[in-house]
UniProtKB/Swiss-Prot annotation:
Name the UniProt record assigns to this protein: Protein Wnt-9
Keyword Secreted on entry: yes
Pfam families associated with the record: wnt
Intrachain disulfide bonds: 90-101
PTM statement from Swiss-Prot or TrEMBL: Palmitoleoylation is required for efficient binding to frizzled receptors. Depalmitoleoylation leads to Wnt signaling pathway inhibition.
Entry's Gene Ontology BP terms: canonical Wnt signaling pathway; cell fate commitment; neuron differentiation
Lineage: Eukaryota, Metazoa, Chordata, Craniata, Vertebrata
Gene: WNT-9
Amino acid sequence: SGSCAVRTCWKQLSSFHETGKLLKLKYETAVRVHSITNDATGETELISPKKHSYTLKNHIPRTTDLVYIEDSPNFCRPSKYSPGTAGRVCSKETNCESMCCGQGYNTQSLLVHRPCHCQV
């Protein structure tokens, strides 16, 4: 008499929440690199900052690190990239503090009259 075993394997994505947490962690620990172009080949290479300026943010990146070449603009202030947060509409209960970059916000109450098109 023999026994049989069936084993089924599959890959499954992490939950959206877990993926978001990991991506945020990678963003917060991203490593700045510089790009140079090899004149002989025309190829661009990414190089880490020099070892003598070593800090937590300036270490040699691993293949799993998120890297960046230049700082992101401050989207809270008006610039060529963004109109800033002035005049932005937000939901007071959920996201005004983050969407207005902690600069405060004004509330406004509106009374709107609309015909109801009721049938009698």
